[in-house]
Amino acid sequence: MAPAALWPQVNGGVEVEFNSSGGSSRLPLAECAAVAFELDCSPVRGFPAFRGQGNYPGLWWFSTTREHVGYESWSERDHLIALDADPAVVGVASQPFRLHWGDGRHHVPDYFVRLSDGTATVLDVRADDRISDADAELFDRSEQACRSLGWAYRRAGVADPVVTANLRWLSGYRHPRVYRPAVAAALEAVFDSARPLMTGVRPVGEAIMVLPVLFHLLWPRRLGVDLSAAVLTEESIVGPALSR
């Protein structure tokens, strides 16, 4: 990454192009710190679709905001699922803006992420083995631009396969219709002390009725389980939410 002393020269001519309810805009970077990209902006570009395409674009129903959010590849989808399950995330925008530099180069980050404390993270998803020197320079420039506004910037590679497998499973129970208040209260009481998953489920009721609610609670981490240790089984240790 370029030394911080060079950031003013790099970022001084940066402009941000985005689409909001008021129309298309292209503003100096310094004027965009307060733009609510996650609330008021549509994607600055679409996803191409053609025969023989090597990636798989689509839409993810983002349970946090109850809106669809786009992804351009399965790798992006996996990271989007993780953002949806993260209780600290309150909003996400796909393809939120295009950064323009004075030398004619430009870049569209994959996601703008708003956190519950009001801070923001800009996310690019690209596997390590798919980053060229030109890509690396654009990611570096993007990080500098974001940091100059107080935003965090992260380039994510391939998501952890075990965590991803668990989140994909739990995501099937993320919809609010799965929630049953009485069952949820009973589960939170029994798992106030950590124990194997099915050991806690059986006293609450029939597994076919109780497990969906348990998975619904594990999705936003209202109950805690180590999703990175192994794929969820009857013996997975479930306990209180880690934030308690």
Show where each model-derived region lies.
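Electrostatic, structured charged patches in enzyme active sites and in nucleic-acid/phosphate-binding
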Residues: 1-244
